[in-house]
């Protein structure tokens, strides 16, 4: 059996979607899986052991003709089934080009409801439902095999780690000389999803006061986030022995570094969600985005939110900065809980 999975973007969504791979392979080891991703995010899935062939489409660069050529060539693979985990019009069209036997969500289960017109097989599942439940639900629907979301608590790492690179990074960053290493991702895709720098600086000070032998690394993805991280250190007046800005990582290096951490803290963003994918302890900070939908809680993967009820997840209020009401002390409590009050 040969199937194709469509999940073009963005980083966090690809990281979360990739969990279905191990469920599929455990069900039937010999299923051949091809994955279609945007060229920009190819690095996160490159050399994935459960993906038999990865197709990178230059859609973000608006290279439509080139993308179409790749798709028409891939269509010759004669897929038994194609599954669109993205649920947008462009991803639905991609799935339709690849096969008539394509699976997606129905019009009531999509943000871009028009996309349902391109699917042959459609699943009804509430758009407000947890994303992992949605992804596993569509996978179950395609393979006619029930996958229990509760099994996510026992999943294997979603991404494999290059042990040689892990050792090199550990030596370069001198990780072994610290009792604990914490990675804090400062950014996110929207301003209102970012924990304020003044509060983050205070949180770092509180953590260091509680755990003097730890090292905090501030993760960033662009120049704006780099400047943000610099300001956090300046505002907190924190010693370089305890905090530093992480280097600019490739996606492969980010996976390896995340796996080396004792704790990862961050906003609702791709790099933060990588912690859950790699079974590393984490705290995800939610403001105006729904924690019940965008994350999966486990004993080691904690969430903190404002307690605000977000019922319409299709239309989130980008002017809502309620994330700033979350107290640093409440995040510290979760850190202490995960570190066992050492």
Curated annotation (Swiss-Prot):
InterPro entries: Glyco_trans_9, LipoPS_heptosylTferase-I, LPS_LOS_Heptosyltrfase. It comes from the Bacteria. ADP-L-glycero-beta-D-manno-heptose binds at residues 188-189, 193, 225, 268-270, 273. One of its GO terms (biological process) is lipopolysaccharide core region biosynthetic process. One of its GO terms (molecular function) is ADP-heptose-lipopolysaccharide heptosyltransferase activity. It is an enzyme of class 2 (transferase). Pathway: Bacterial outer membrane biogenesis; LPS core biosynthesis. One of its GO terms (cellular component) is cytosol. Belongs to the glycosyltransferase 9 family. Can complement a S.typhimurium mutant lacking this gene. This is Lipopolysaccharide heptosyltransferase 1. It comes from Campylobacter coli.
